[in-house]
Structure formats: structure tokens, C-alpha cells
């Protein structure tokens, strides 16, 4: 069929048109790490976490941190944000590696370590190949150690939803790697959990080795939730407007947020 003979397009409500509500949907993605001025109500937590990880910026050992808080309180967001800034702030040629593991997906020791090795490895630089499957846990650890020493002075690892991991010994092995002579680079672990009692159920040997500092994230209040919404207002542009209600808002406190339609 030639272009001249092709049928004209017909608007069908079943499919999206070229006009969409959101100009930049990346701002709404769960894994998106926004700029510092978009993170609301977490200045104190950012500062406290940065203090614990400060050693990595100078090539020393970062501290291990256990972060607690309910779902949706910014634990993962702040952790990723601070790690990103630590990488950018690294001084005097210090190389910092960071990796994020979702323990809801990689919930076995082997899965977590193989994912870490794959994420932290730059094969073109190290010459190391990390297969997704097929190796024993101990071999994946060896690949991870080789990968880290080949590239980094310090590494910060985020283990999100650590309470879903079926073997907490991964905390001990990662946090003791340098002390045990497995690697020369320093490793710090940020473990995140919704369950404040998680550490109470951790093996005593693991707990003793991990030697973590604790950080608790309180739920956002109504004002912070409202500010979060408006801090992402520019995910839209200035055409058609839509209004949504936000629970707990009143007319006197800007009870309606406007989202404007835009074309990509």
C-alpha cells in the first residue's frame, strides 16, 4: 500500500491520542531519583545518612546503616539520592561504586550477590564476565570481590526490603569482606525495612558483625504531602487542566491540585 492510498487515521477512544496528561512521566516513576530541591521533609534524614557515609567520599569505610519506616516515607529515595551525591562528591580520585538491590525480587543470597556483581561490574573495564545464572553462591562472591577491587575504593550497597531476604548472612559477609581479607576496597551497607523489629530477629553473629547505626523515617504530614505534589507540578505544561482531590485537603489549604495536559 502506498502512502497515497493508505486510509486516513480515525480517532479511537480505545487508544491514546497524541495529547497526554503528563509531560514528563519520569517524575512519577517509583525508581526516579529527583533533584535535592524536590525531596520534601527529609533534610534531617539526608544529613544523618550522609554523615554515616562520609568516609566513602574520602576513601575510608562508610558506616553500615539500618533504615526503618512505613511504606512511602522516602527511605529508598533518600538512600539513592545520598549515594548519588556521595559519588559526585568523591575527592582526590576516590572511586565510589553504588548498587541498589530490591530484596523482594532478589530474595536469596545467590540472587542478591549475582545481581550485585552484575550491576557493579563494567566488563569492558574489568574483563570479568558475570553470568546471570549457573554459578554457586561462593563463586558469585568471588566474582563480586574481584569486580569491586578492580574498580572501586569504596562501595555503598542498598538492600531494600531486607526483611524479605531469606538469609540474613549476606549482611555479615558484605560488611566483613574487607576485615576478612576478601577485598581491599571498603563496603558500607544500607539495609531498609518496613519492620522496626527486623534486627531483633537477626542472627546474633550477623548483628554483631553488621554493627549498624539506625535511622527512622516518620510518615509525611499533610503539609509535606501537599508540597510533594506541587514540587512535581512541572511534569505538565500549560494546556488543558484537570483537577483532583487530595484526602485531608480543605479549600483554605489549596484543596485542589491542577495537572495540565501536554504533548510529548
Swiss-Prot record:
Gene behind the chain: orc2
User: What does the record list as GO biological process?
Assistant: DNA replication
This protein is called ORC1-type DNA replication protein 2
Superkingdom to which the source organism belongs: Archaea
Q: Which UniProt keywords apply?
A: ATP-binding, DNA replication, Nucleotide-binding, Plasmid
Q: Does the keyword Nucleotide-binding apply?
A: yes
- Briefly state the protein's biological role: Involved in regulation of DNA replication.
Q: Describe the family membership recorded for this protein in Swiss-Prot or TrEMBL.
A: Belongs to the CDC6/cdc18 family.
- Regions annotated as coiled coil: none
Q: Which residues are noted in the entry as ATP-binding?
A: 73-77, 220, 232
Q: Record's InterPro entries?
A: AAA+_ATPase (IPR003593), AAA_22 (IPR049945), ORC1/CDC6 (IPR050311), Orc1/Cdc6_arc (IPR014277), P-loop_NTPase (IPR027417)
The record, for Pfam families, names: AAA_22
Q: Which GO terms describe its molecular function?
A: ATP binding; ATP hydrolysis activity
In terms of Gene3D superfamilies, this protein maps to: P-loop containing nucleotide triphosphate hydrolases (3.40.50.300)
Summarize the record's disruption phenotype note.
Essential for normal growth.
Amino acid at each position: 500500500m502506498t502512502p497515497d492510498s493508505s486510509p486516513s487515521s480515525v480517532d479511537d477512544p480505545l487508544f491514546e491520542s497524541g495529547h497526554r496528561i503528563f509531560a514528563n512521566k519520569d517524575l512519577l516513576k517509583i525508581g526516579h531519583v529527583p533533584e535535592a530541591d524536590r525531596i520534601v521533609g527529609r533534610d534531617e534524614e539526608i544529613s544523618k545518612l550522609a554523615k554515616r557515609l562520609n568516609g566513602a567520599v574520602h576513601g575510608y569505610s562508610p558506616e553500615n546503616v539500618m533504615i526503618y519506616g512505613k511504606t512511602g516515607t522516602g527511605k529508598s529515595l533518600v538512600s539513592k539520592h545520598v549515594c548519588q551525591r556521595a559519588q559526585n562528591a568523591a575527592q582526590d580520585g576516590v572511586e565510589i561504586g553504588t548498587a541498589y538491590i530490591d530484596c523482594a525480587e532478589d530474595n536469596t543470597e545467590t540472587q542478591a550477590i549475582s545481581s550485585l556483581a552484575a550491576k557493579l561490574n563494567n566488563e569492558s573495564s574489568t574483563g570479568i564476565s558475570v553470568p546471570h545464572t549457573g554459578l554457586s553462591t561462593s563463586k558469585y562472591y568471588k566474582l563480586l570481590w574481584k569486580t569491586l577491587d578492580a574498580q572501586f575504593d569504596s562501595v555503598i550497597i542498598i538492600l531494600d526490603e531486607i526483611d524479605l531476604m531469606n538469609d540474613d548472612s549476606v549482611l555479615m559477609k558484605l560488611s566483613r569482606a574487607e576485615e576478612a581479607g576478601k577485598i581491599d576496597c571498603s563496603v558500607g551497607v544500607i539495609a531498609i525495612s518496613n519492620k522496626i523489629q527486623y534486627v531483633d530477629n537477626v542472627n546474633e553473629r550477623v548483628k554483631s558483625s553488621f554493627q549498624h547505626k539506625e535511622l527512622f523515617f516518620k510518615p509525611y504530614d499533610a503539609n509535606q504531602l501537599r508540597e510533594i505534589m506541587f514540587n512535581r507540578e512541572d511534569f505538565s505544561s500549560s494546556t488543558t487542566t484537570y483537577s483532583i482531590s487530595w484526602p485531608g485537603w480543605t479549600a483554605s489549604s489549596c484543596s485542589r491540585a491542577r495537572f495540565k495536559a501536554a504533548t510529548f
